[in-house]
Curated annotation (Swiss-Prot):
Domain notes: The VCA (verprolin, cofilin, acidic) domain promotes actin polymerization by the Arp2/3 complex in vitro.
The family this protein is said to belong to: Belongs to the WASH1 family.
Protein name per Swiss-Prot or TrEMBL: Putative WAS protein family homolog 3
GO term, biological process aspect, one: protein targeting to lysosome
Amino acid sequence: MTPVRMQHSLAGQTYAVPLIQPDLRREEAVQQMADALQYLQKVSGDIFSRISQQVEQSRSQVQAIGEKVSLAQAKIEKIKGSKKAIKVFSSAKYPAPERLQEYGSIFTGAQDPGLQRRPRHRIQSKHRPLDERALQEKDFPVCVSTKPEPEDDAEEGLGGLPSNISSVSSLLLFNTTENLGKKYVFLDPLAGAVTKTHVMLGAETEEKLFDAPLSISKREQLEQQVPENYFYVPDLGQVPEIDVPSYLPDLPGITNDLMYIADLGPGIAPSAPGTIPELPTFHTEVAEPLKVDLQDGVLTPPPPPPPPPPAPEVLASAPPLPPSTAAPVGQGARQDDSSSSASPSVQGAPREVVDPSGGRATLLESIRQAGGIGKAKLRSMKERKLEKKQQKEQEQVRATSQGGHLMSDLFNKLVMRRKGISGKGPGAGEGPGGAFARVSDSIPPLPPPQQPQAEEDEDDWES
């Protein structure tokens, strides 16, 4: 006889230990007990082996995590005493797989040992004969009360009708929820079942005015509500000012090779009005104005000035004339020339241009009053070049003394690169003038123009 297997197992439960049935023969009961104990031993051995495998797997994971922790601790100990700034780059993604591994039970893939075919045993003994005594042993009397409990199903009626109702049709009221019964149940979904009578209904049917608002009853004035502003208004807030030194030497855990410049980078409130940085002042000369070229937002050094043209020999040799004698001579010459040769360009010119006492006469008069070339305080080109060179060196020294400014370093590097490209660097063997100065020196000066004064005026107007 094979043992009966219980099928009340849960979902995913693999093992099912058989139970020993009652009323078995002695030999049969002993055989089933031995089979059940053997099956239970196999099941317990399989369960504990799977648990030990899971524990070993978890222990290996914990050991790998411990190795990572020890490696990170060793790196921290190595850089703990360093005073250099170290950048730590963290991964942009969380160090985990995109799809987590689903949890699997440790009993997945387990097979029920009871499904294997077991040996069959032949039993010689016979069953015990069933008699009256055996039936009485199996009989268990149970007291059960079969008396039904009385149910209270009596429902309360609606009560009596009013005395003025004479027919059934009077009970039908069109488009109302009122019941003519003296006592009925009014169903309210919010308050529940409420029993009302006609007296209560009569009190409710009286129309009442609503209470007056507080502004009328208590004569209070309503406060005007201020509309809320949902626009974004950036506010820097009150930032505490901390007066600390810029360099703190010999502090543990503090780097000494970092420099922070507050002017670089945008502010925390881009829409707030920012402070305008102070621009450097440039000194200009009277004889030659300094032109600053801007290329892509970077200052470029000014080009070398060309050599001055040679002075005319007539002005250098002739003594300066007084303004009283020079004016009538010039006017007489202009009158003779204008009467002899009248060009169409002069005839079509306006009156201010034809008038000889215009801006040109005042310019010549101011030159004569200044004393001419002999008394003019002019400097040579070598002095100008030396002064410009000294100014550049002072600006470079001032920029390097400030230290750490990004724009000044970039400007100095660009200046040195341009000097190296143009051949004006410190390693070049040429003089301060360079190749351009030597070429300009080799060009002979132009001869002075030998033309009358009237033709000069006509050429000026045509140009």
